[in-house]
């Protein structure tokens, strides 16, 4: 059950992230080199991979929790060490940018925690 919850958390995170990137590519085009349809198209591979990971979490093979956890950790590390110090700062972020970043990263941490509980065999108690 934790895997399904993690999958839904990732669905929300990916939808928020994709909507944000579309907004940046259209309404903020030219603000930085990262605010363009070209940058958006280059990042679509990540969203396709995310969709495949989410689908595997919903389908439920035994390895899906491990793959989902690895995916979350990689995305978190990228966010902390590349996206925030490079991309965000070049974008001249406003309140929407920071809120999206905090919500997105928070959701990744929630999904990673749920998946870690799953791979360790832990359960949440009511």
Question: What is each residue range found by the language model?
Answer:
Residues 1-18, 107-110, 114-126:
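Cytosolic juxtamembrane helix and N-cap/initiation of the first transmembrane helix
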Residues 44, 93-110:
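Individual transmembrane alpha-helices with interfacial aromatic-anchor signatures
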Residues 80-100, 120-123:
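Membrane-helix boundary connector in multi-pass membrane proteins
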Residues 2-5, 22-37, 92:
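Short juxtamembrane and helix-loop transition motifs at transmembrane-helix boundaries
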Residues 15-28, 54:
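Membrane-embedded alpha-helical segments in integral membrane proteins
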Residues 16, 36-58, 70-77:
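Core segments of alpha-helical transmembrane spans in multipass integral membrane proteins
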Residues 67-84, 106-110:
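Hydrophobic alpha-helical membrane segments
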Residues 61-64:
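Membrane-helix interface segments
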